Every structure is written in structure tokens, then in C-alpha cells.
Amino acid sequence: VVVDGITVINPDHYTVFGGGSVGVTIRNLKSFSCKGWSDGIDMMCCHDVLIDNVFMRNSDDCIALYNHRWNWWGGSDNITVQNSILWADIAHPINVGGHGDPESLIGETIENLIFRNIDILEHDEDDVPYQGCMAIDAGDRNRVKNILFEDIRVESIQEGKLFHINIRFNPKYDKQPGQSIDGVTFRNITYNGVGENPSLIKGLDKERMVRNITFENVVVNGEKIKDLKGFITNEYI
């Protein structure tokens, strides 16, 4: 399936929704939304997806990648988002890992995701648990692994944070906690701004930990991140 060169203005819900889809290309898409729940591109249990050269200004998540929801099962893998501009008037520019299969004994995996050469123009979310320009929020028995964020430029955060990496149990959305986050690299990330909340990296407990998070040339207000000073963390990382 190829979606190429369309402009969508004020849809009632998602601009593009993928459920159990394989081999999808979305390119040269422009999306402008202002209604509640009007995410840009949401993918549930999709595989082999390329999102290229899109402009998303949305009144919810610009890009959201999930596992099981509604009638789709089977995990998610091999999704690339590149050469794009994201502007989130509420919620996240990039959000990974929220929905999964709480009834499964082993859960589902979302893996092998690449986000590269992306400009984030704005992030404005007043509800702290849902903040994060680059958010990985593993719930509902999800396992998240092998994620690359590369060459990302963040211009403005009105209300929000830069990074949010969390294994969660949120009763509003989850029936079970997430399982793991393993292998996330942030490379060549820049942000210049003031007033953002501290970034967060947290596991849930000894069985549900965050592992192998790498920062390479991440520069905030001209200073390279060398440690997690200023981050919110816990002992489960």
C-alpha cells in the first residue's frame, strides 16, 4: 500500500491508521488536525512500514506505534520514519509502545524501529505522564527493543520533556504492566530551549527493567549529555 502526496485537514480522528498491515509506504503526506484524538499516523501491529517526508501538525500524537489494539495482534517490527517534520499541539511528536495484549502469557514485541532526520517544531502537553518528544511507554505486557533515534532536532517545548522512557502500569489504558525496554540509541540529537521538564528513564521493578540505553552526541543548549544528571530515574535501569 502506498499513500503519496495527499494533504488532510481537520480529520475527525487519525489521518492514517494501520491495523495489521504489512508493506506500507507513506510519503509526502501533510496533516493538520485540531480535534480530540486526531493523531497523525497510528500503527497497530504493523510490519515493514516506511514513513518518509511527511509534515504533521496534530492535536494528539503525530506518530504513534503500538501493538495489539481492537482487532489486531502479532507485534510490530521494521518501521522507519525519516526526513520529516513533526509539530504536536498536544501529546507526543513520537510515541511508542502504549497498547498491547494483556491477555497473552508472553506479551507482544515492538522492535526494529528507526526515526532519523526529523525536525520537531513543537511539543506542548500539560499532563506530565504523557509528555515526551521521544517517548517509549511500554504497557500491557509489551516488550520494546532495538530502537534508533538519529539526527533529531527539537526546536521548542512549551510544556513537556525531551525523553520519556518508561515501563508503566497506567490503569486508564493498561490491564497489565509492560515487560521490558531494551536497546534504545539516541544519536545526534539537539535541543535548544528553556522550561522543559526533566527527561525520564524508569523501569517498574526487578522483573520489568529498562536496559541498554545509549546517548551519542546528544546536545542540550550547547552542552553534550555525559551522564543522567537532571534525569528522573530509578533503580530499575
Language-model region placement:
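Extracellular/periplasmic carbohydrate-active domains that bind, remodel
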Residues: 1-237
